[in-house]
């Protein structure tokens, strides 16, 4: 694994490794949004209840906030044709489209790199 400072030292783009960045809790503050949606602690709320509340929160995925420091990370990695990784949940049928909307609204990742 390379440290981000090691990537800066590379002079030739062909020498760079692929960069993969997670979405939830790396770029996007999922837990903060989930806590707000359930009106308390997401992890301490009954599983069915918490997902029902998220399902009922219009635009939940598309309107999540950036994680602290995530814009700085994003601005660094986007220069290197980075990939974003994220899973969608079957507990919320809007999660996939919502995450794609968030990425489209807030980033310039190539569609192929998502």
Regions found by a protein language model. Give the residues of each.
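Short, acidic loop-to-helix structural element flanking the phosphoryl-transfer center
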Residues: 46, 55-84, 92-97
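Short glycine/proline-enriched coil/turn segments at helix->beta-strand junctions
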Residues: 40, 77-82, 107-110
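Substrate-recognition "cap/lid" segment bordering the active-site pocket of phosphatases
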Residues: 85-114
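Non-transmembrane alpha-helical segments in soluble domains
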Residues: 31, 35, 74, 100-104
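Short, flexible, glycine/charge-rich loop motifs used to bind or transfer phosphoryl groups or to couple energy/partner
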Residues: 9-10, 72-73, 114
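Short acidic, low-complexity intrinsically disordered linear motifs used
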Residues: 1-12
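Active-site neighborhood of HAD-like aspartate-dependent phosphohydrolases
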Residues: 11-59
């Amino acid at each position: 694994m390379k440290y981000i400072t090691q990537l800066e030292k590379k002079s030739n783009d062909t020498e760079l490794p692929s960069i993969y960045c997670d979405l939830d809790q790396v770029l996007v503050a999922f837990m903060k949004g989930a806590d707000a949606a359930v009106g308390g602690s997401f992890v301490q709320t009954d599983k069915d209840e918490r997902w029902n509340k998220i399902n009922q929160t219009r635009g939940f995925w598309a309107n999540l906030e950036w994680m602290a420091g995530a814009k700085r990370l994003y601005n660094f990695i986007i220069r290197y044709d980075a990939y974003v990784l994220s899973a969608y949940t079957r507990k919320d049928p809007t999660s996939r489209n919502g995450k794609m909307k968030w990425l489209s609204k807030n980033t310039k990742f190539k569609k192929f790199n998502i």
